[in-house]
């Protein structure tokens, strides 16, 4: 029960963080990405890569937290995986819709796919780690 509460709390925290980032106007969002530019200034299109990597990573963490939350319930592992991916996809859609109402931001279907891919990747890596004898949590 403690693990369930922990993972649900982590999921809600990540969702809140995503919502916060999506609430930032275009200029503020760009400044957040540009913070990392000095480290990667030699890479072409570094700002674009930073933003897309952030999408992949934060939705990967969300997918992982969804999977861990669902795995505390008495349901099959395949069902946990599928439901986690569906939840990531749904939250990615809602995130892009939210961004479309934010000044200087837009709704991009490609980001929904990237977010879902990030979530799916983290979920699959977690299940492979567990299958190889890693921790169950």
Q: PLM features: residue spans?
A:
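Membrane-interface helix-boundary motifs at transmembrane edges
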Residues: 1-3, 71-79
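Interfacial helix-loop-helix junctions of multi-pass membrane proteins
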Residues: 93-116
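Terminal transmembrane helix and immediately flanking juxtamembrane interfaces
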Residues: 1-22, 110, 119-137
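Short alpha-helical transmembrane interface motifs in multi-pass membrane proteins
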Residues: 47-51, 79-84
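"…centered on the first transmembrane helix and the immediately adjacent amphipathic helix/loop
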Residues: 1-67
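Small-polar-interrupted transmembrane alpha-helices in polytopic inner-membrane proteins
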Residues: 13-18, 80-100
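Membrane-interfacial alpha-helical segments at the cytosolic side of multi-pass membrane proteins
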Residues: 56-72, 117-132
